[in-house]
Design a protein with these regions (language model features):
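Switch/communication elements of ASCE P-loop NTPase nucleotide-binding domains
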Residues: 1-73, 199, 213, 219-371
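Phosphate-coordinating catalytic segments in nucleotide- and nucleic-acid-processing enzymes
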Residues: 49-257, 262, 344-371
Length: 371
């Protein structure tokens, strides 16, 4: 598990301030305050580590995020080196600090210039000769790219806020990893087809608990396409998803990912509450917390839903999670200033340690106008 992180000169994060993390982390706050940037920083490291060059260069546009150029993610007021520091809870309790700079003055690249593990520098400097007086230097991790702590960034899943809506059929694709359904859920139907009816029925059962009824069917046709059917009641023949409530298609990638993810995985989810009735949001929260416990998943959930937040509180009251398993991160920012992250804890009775302005207060504000 990643137990803390700090960002410096990454988008709205100017100073290296430490943020404590837990098994389940809810990211809340007004729009444009740094929640998505927080998620992007970790996804950027994960996709870079998984790329051909590893962490020697930042993979700015990859399988998780497309962020443009290195200059696009540098803090606009600083333009200094981009630094990410994180600690893990593995047996070595790795403390990793990584810094990147623009590559040979080319703003589209981010080249690694420092990698320290618990205070020890592991970067190798490699010369790229262009003459005695004009020799340039590049840096690389070399064989040290397998150091402890980096394994925390390999087992990563991401479900974007921009999920694929209702789809009636897709082209067959047998070359995909059936445990990876895509950040938009674009490979979901192929994954269901490969997993078979037993798994599909299990997904339908979980979906039914959240949405009070569900049927899922995949028809393997004689053509190059798979047909997909949904319904809002159990044990039906199903209908085209375009004729069923939008929430079914939008929640399905979340349910499947938590059922397919390897144990110990890091899962990033944006706006799980989208297109869901408040009751369904609460039941989804219960599903998320239970799966986190059962499968030892570390969750990072960006949400604007009080029902998701209260679901985390209830999970602690009901004993599904321990107090130390939960953290609410509330992101705030004034004008062009630094992003401030309030780290809110939950006690055994579900009480919150802090209520910063703008956090779970809109209901009270509206009620005061109605009385």
């Amino acid at each position: 598990m990643i137990k803390e992180i700090a960002l410096e000169n990454f988008k709205c994060y100017k100073k290296l301030n430490t943020i404590q993390l837990a098994k389940v982390n809810l990211l809340a706050g007004s729009n444009g305050r740094g929640k998505s940037s927080f998620i992007q920083a970790l996804l950027l490291l994960a996709q870079s580590l998984d790329s051909e060059k590893g962490l020697n260069h930042l993979e700015m546009n990859g399988r998780f995020v497309e962020l443009g150029t290195f200059a696009d993610v540098q803090n606009s007021e600083s333009k200094g080196n981009l630094t990410i520091r994180y600690k893990t809870d593995d047996k070595d309790e790795s403390d990793i600090l990584i810094s990147f700079s623009s590559y040979e003055n080319k703003t589209q690249w981010g080249e690694i210039i420092s990698f320290t593990l618990s205070g020890k520098e592991l970067i190798e400097e490699m010369g790229s000769a262009t003459g005695e007086n004009g020799e340039q230097k590049s840096h690389g991790l070399g064989v040290t790219s397998t150091v402890a702590g980096l394994s925390q960034l390999y087992n990563v899943y991401y479900i974007s806020a921009d999920r694929r809506g209702p789809v009636d059929f897709v082209k067959k694709n047998d070359n995909r990893d059936d445990n990876q359904i895509g950040i938009h859920g674009e490979f979901l139907i192929n994954s269901l087809a490969k997993k078979g009816k037993d798994f599909t029925d299990k997904v339908a059962s979980e979906l039914s608990k959240i949405l009070s009824g569900a049927t899922i069917q995949v028809e393997n046709t004689d053509t190059d396409y798979l047909r997909f059917y949904l319904d809002s009641v159990n044990d039906s023949k199903g209908f085209r998803p375009t004729n069923v409530g939008f929430g079914y298609s939008y929640i399905l990638p979340i349910v499947m990912t938590l059922m397919l993810a390897e144990k110990g995985a890091k899962i990033f989810i944006e706006n799980p509450e989208a297109h869901l009735h408040p009751g369904a949001q609460s039941r989804l929260a219960d599903f998320l917390m239970r799966k986190s416990k059962e499968r030892d998943l570390q969750l990072f959930i960006e949400t604007h839903s009080d029902h998701i937040i209260n679901g985390l509180r209830i999970a602690i009251v009901d004993g599904i999670l321990e107090e130390s398993d939960a953290r609410i991160l509330f992101f705030s920012r004034e004008g062009l200033g630094d992003t401030n992250v309030y780290q809110i804890k939950i006690d055994s009775k579900g009480n919150l340690s802090d209520y910063p302005d703008g956090f779970m207060d809109e209901w009270g504000i509206q009620m005061s106008k109605l009385v």
